[in-house]
Amino acid sequence: MNFLVVIVTTVSLAGAASAGEIQNLYQFGKMVMCLGNLNVLEGLEYNGYGCYCGRGGKGTPLDDTDRCCKQHDECYERATDEMGCWSIETYATTYDYTKSKVSGKCTIKCKLESDYSRFTIRKKCKAFICECDRIGAQCFADKRSTFNRSLISYTKDKC
């Protein structure tokens, strides 16, 4: 069953993303599913949700879930503006993290910059982008009660 989940997720993302982007989106998706205790189909519903979830983002967020996506986008902007990460890195870099479940509750811990090997390239960006994704996924979990099914695949032209 896990193999099927990986295939479905990868194929769903492949139409709109490069190979690096797929890996990064896959990592973010795994965080979203773990922290939110969601299955793969529920996790995929965030892509294209509201005005900010998925590719692009504009206008005013429509609810707290959409605000999580706006904050995630802003974190990626800080990665380029303040951390010196390349724009492509925010979507294409892969990073290291650990996840654990205690009493059915998932926790995610991103590898710190100092914990990467000295031979690792762009470790500051890897650590920062992982934190962006972890915080975004935690926001989705915290705001899951605001998730509005009518905002799935929302037309961005309305934003």
UniProtKB/Swiss-Prot annotation:
Catalytic activity: a 1,2-diacyl-sn-glycero-3-phosphocholine + H2O = a 1-acyl-sn-glycero-3-phosphocholine + a fatty acid + H(+)
Enzyme Commission designation: 3.1.1.4
Domain of life: Eukaryota
Disulfide-linked positions: C51-C159, C53-C69, C68-C139, C75-C132, C85-C125, C110-C130
Cofactors required: Ca(2+)
Entry similarity comment: Belongs to the phospholipase A2 family. Group I subfamily.
Name of the protein: Phospholipase A2 AP-PLA2-I
Naturally occurring in which organism (per UniProt): Acanthaster planci
